[in-house]
């Protein structure tokens, strides 16, 4: 399970653990780069984190060769696991759960710029240049919405309809673009990252029904 921007596994993934236990599953909680107990100095909005996700998937497949896994992420972690889906993954990975991930680094950065009452189209090129010069990565080099066009794994998209940080419309865009088996589960009244707490019973039923055959 992969947490969001400037989060940590310990703080942000407690609800995810509860979901897993409710479905009779185990969970691996990952501190993403530049967070928690992990190293690193730059957050790349899921671009390099998606490669870390692939490494974790390979590690788990080696340690537990008889288990099946679902890549789960919330917020930036959701975009991370979606982007990881374009890379070669072990056969034990049977699905992806994206909880309120954004459609692309560029889209979420522009949205935050707009929230600051600045012109996104004018300001974004400077943010991008700063990321390239000082962060060593290009925000335009990765995109969840482009990744899901190549996805072959089943994807469970979920989002709170009242999310004012990552708009629910971004999950709708990702869902529409996704080429594999998919479902979009939205929760009225739920804010950012709160789709599960807002209606746990309905969430678990939808999740369990969708992945039932994959996890057999």
What are these regions (language model features)?
Residues 190-204:
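Catalytic histidine-centered segment of alpha/beta-hydrolase-like enzymes
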Residues 150-152, 157-159, 163:
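Short beta-strand/loop motif that positions the catalytic acidic residue
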Residues 64-75:
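Alpha/beta-hydrolase fold nucleophile elbow
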Residues 144, 153, 167-176:
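Short alpha-helix in the alpha/beta-hydrolase fold that links the catalytic acid
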Residues 83-138, 146:
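Hydrolase active-site cap/lid region
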